[in-house]
Curated annotation (Swiss-Prot):
<keyword id="KW-0067">ATP-binding</keyword>
<dbReference type="InterPro" id="IPR027417">
    <property type="entry name" value="P-loop_NTPase"/>
</dbReference>
<feature type="site" description="Interaction with substrate tRNA">
    <location>
        <position position="127"/>
    </location>
</feature>
<keyword id="KW-0460">Magnesium</keyword>
<feature type="site" description="Interaction with substrate tRNA">
    <location>
        <position position="101"/>
    </location>
</feature>
<comment type="similarity">
    <text>Belongs to the IPP transferase family.</text>
</comment>
<dbReference type="GO" id="GO:0005524">
    <property type="term" value="F:ATP binding"/>
</dbReference>
<feature type="region of interest" description="Interaction with substrate tRNA">
    <location>
        <begin position="35"/>
        <end position="38"/>
    </location>
</feature>
<dbReference type="GO" id="GO:0006400">
    <property type="term" value="P:tRNA modification"/>
</dbReference>
<protein>
    <recommendedName>
        <fullName>tRNA dimethylallyltransferase</fullName>
        <ecNumber>2.5.1.75</ecNumber>
    </recommendedName>
</protein>
<dbReference type="Pfam" id="PF01715">
    <property type="entry name" value="IPPT"/>
</dbReference>
<dbReference type="InterPro" id="IPR039657">
    <property type="entry name" value="Dimethylallyltransferase"/>
</dbReference>
<feature type="binding site">
    <location>
        <begin position="12"/>
        <end position="17"/>
    </location>
    <ligand>
        <name>substrate</name>
    </ligand>
</feature>
<keyword id="KW-0808">Transferase</keyword>
<dbReference type="InterPro" id="IPR018022">
    <property type="entry name" value="IPT"/>
</dbReference>
<comment type="subunit">
    <text>Monomer.</text>
</comment>
<keyword id="KW-0547">Nucleotide-binding</keyword>
Amino acid sequence: MKTKIIVIVGPTAVGKTALAIEVAKRFNGEVVSGDSQQVYRGLDIGTAKASPEEQAAVPHHLIDVREITESYSAFDFVSEAKMTIEDIHSRGKLAIIAGGTGLYIQSLLEGYHLGGETPHEEILAYRASLEPYSDXELAHLVEQAGLEIPQFNRRRAMRALEIAHFGQDLENQEILYEPLIICLDDERSQLYERINHRVDLMFEAGLLDEAKWLFDHSPNVQAAKGIGYKELFPYFRGEQTFEEARESLKQATRRFAKRQLTWFRNRMQVTFYQIGESGVQDRILSQIEEFLDD
């Protein structure tokens, strides 16, 4: 029997953390971060980690598990998330995956091949090469490969092509979980306003000092490439004014949010909820309760 888990995704600044904490309190759960940047110690403000008070109220996992000089990949996330979920489930609690790194979360849910003779990065690279194709083009590739997919959808097509390309058996792609995937969204103008406001709050909380520390110590590491830091480096080099750098960060974050939504819409089977609608949290909690009771 597959383990039931709750997955909360959506663009940055939409309220994933707050909802995950509420779900954890309501259903005796623990939160597993699905964010590629929150793994780094010392990068707290720019990655929008749950506050110490929030982490004290509900157990959080896969936060602060790497030094800024260390790398982190989808392989690392899947391996560590699987162990974490197993531990949470063994204690009779509900695992709640919350984050905005679509590749990591999709890798976990779809059981990406993490061993065997084919290097994991080759598989991810092949999948990435399929992403630009439209549904019709993918269907044509599937037909050319002589594959049959009942109830065609994009996810099945990409997976079938991957298996055909690398010669892997379907059984090797182990699906361990039965997820309920909730995607939070907002009206575009409202979301962008939330993003701009959050960036302002980050600066008030000390983002500039955090980014300067990273710039001074490890400007070329993977951790420094995340949105929230690299946009400020031109200011530290004297190439931009502070206001220009702040606006650059807001713009980059808005673009990132758009890419996140595109990923969740096209790559994952999600249930969308508009956070601005009346009673939306109650509807989400009701859906989760029905899912867990089923």
